[in-house]
Amino acid sequence: MVRNEKKCIGIIFGGTSNEHYVSISSAKTVFKALISRTNKELFRIKAFYINKHGVWIDSDLSLEILRENSGNNIFEKYQELPNRKINFLNNLEFQNIDIWFPLLHGCNGEDGAIHGLLKFTQKPLIGCGISGSAIGMDKILMKQIFSNLSIPQVNFLAIQNYDLSDDNVKDNLSVEIIEKLNLPVFVKPANSGSSLGISKAKNKSEIIKALQKAWEIDSRIVIEEGLNVRELECGIIGNLKLSTSKIGEVSYSSDWYDYDSKYSTDNKIIIPADIDSQISEQIKDLAIRSCRALNIYGFARVDFFLEKISRKIFLNEINTIPGFTSKSMFPMLWKASGLNIDQLVAKLIDISLDS
């Protein structure tokens, strides 16, 4: 795409979810890519930080946050800034934005909430729309759609509309889970990211504790059968035509890939994954098929399980705003596929303008 003038990119980051600091780290990476030697003559930047209370902070101060080299503790001082608050719909700062780049992970961001708000500005955004974001975040809806389309998944149960403050309810549900699924199981909030609120349970008492932990985050819960698997991931970019990255694998020393493992220095990311070409092509085909099924476009990361003994492939989930941190798989996948972070960010902007 030929650009005649600098495009103003509006980065939105922070937010009220438990992934607040991950969002800040992702935004810093994108900010550095936009001011790189490759991109600095192509783009202008406005940034909008949303603090933990849901308050939008003005662009000048938000850019200061992205320029900070300190650790995440520095952001605590930005939680109470009554004189720097802005009203989204009435503020002139938003009128000069050409393209939005929302980097809000988790609830009130990745779930389509921010996409709906930004639609009122009538400006393009990087990523998919409201419906794809909402379904991609909701593990129950996503799994039900995949089941209807015979996309392979691990066996699962969905729990909705139960009062898990009642011990008898938790006890009865744990019995049902043991009857219907092989142990161990993974108990997950339906709407959560970065493995927050997820537990591995090997017996009834652990299931009861896991249900309580998940319910504290979301009243809707998914229980999945645990298998002996490798964890593989594929990046997706594009609109009408979706392109896939190389396949990556996450190797970890812990019992399973929990929140601490995801952001641990002990992880090993292997790109390309040590798999044969047939499995690689199957994963890429399933990644495109699943994104099409949920109306997901722009960019996403699709996660898979590869059962070690049977070599069966199972789709795990789709992340519609995958992490852009220095430890995140998505930019690493595309770097291995020929796009460094500066090129990747510019490519995503071009894709949004072509949509």
UniProtKB/Swiss-Prot annotation:
Reaction equations catalysed: 2 D-alanine + ATP = D-alanyl-D-alanine + ADP + phosphate + H(+)
The entry's keywords: ATP-binding, Cell shape, Cell wall biogenesis/degradation, Cytoplasm, Ligase, Magnesium, Manganese, Metal-binding, Nucleotide-binding, Peptidoglycan synthesis
Subcellular location: Cytoplasm
Database matches in HAMAP family: Dala_Dala_lig
A GO cellular component annotation in the UniProt record: cytosol
UniProt-listed InterPro entries: ATP-grasp (IPR011761), ATP_grasp_subdomain_1 (IPR013815), D-Ala_lig_Van_CS (IPR000291), D_ala_D_ala (IPR005905), Dala_Dala_lig_C (IPR011095), Dala_Dala_lig_N (IPR011127), PreATP-grasp_dom_sf (IPR016185)
Protein name according to UniProt: D-alanine--D-alanine ligase
Enzyme superclass (EC): ligase
Domain ATP-grasp: residue ranges: 143-350
Enzyme Commission (EC) number: 6.3.2.4
UniProt record, GO biological process: cell wall organization; peptidoglycan biosynthetic process; regulation of cell shape
One Gene Ontology MF term: D-alanine-D-alanine ligase activity
UniProt cofactor note: Binds 2 magnesium or manganese ions per subunit.
Function: Cell wall formation.
Signal peptide positions on this chain: none
Record-linked Gene3D superfamilies: 3.40.50.20, ATP-grasp fold, A domain, ATP-grasp fold, B domain
Residues binding Mg(2+) 1, per UniProt: D303, E317
Organism annotation: Prochlorococcus marinus (strain MIT 9515)
